[in-house]
């Protein structure tokens, strides 16, 4: 069941899943992409906007050691663009 517009939900993103797949020196950038994909999939959103706080938390310990999991607060809103409804998910630290 998708998140309703205006509703806030807290997700725990399992960043640990990418650690075996991605080389050490690509982990933090790939973790940001993973958070974006995870939220888009679970919130059924076409666009995902990640706050700078989430980005800084991922990069806090450098490029090689992102956190194993991250609790994020997701708020979904709908916009009209050219007559089509677009779901946008805003991601912030929980």
UniProtKB/Swiss-Prot annotation:
Pfam families: Ribosomal_L31e. It comes from the Archaea. GO terms for molecular function: structural constituent of ribosome. GO terms for biological process: cytoplasmic translation. One of its GO terms (cellular component) is cytosolic large ribosomal subunit. Keywords: Ribonucleoprotein, Ribosomal protein. Coiled coil: none annotated. SUPFAM superfamilies: Ribosomal protein L31e (SSF54575). Belongs to the eukaryotic ribosomal protein eL31 family. HAMAP family: Ribosomal_eL31. This is Large ribosomal subunit protein eL31. It comes from Pyrococcus abyssi (strain GE5 / Orsay). The gene is rpl31e.
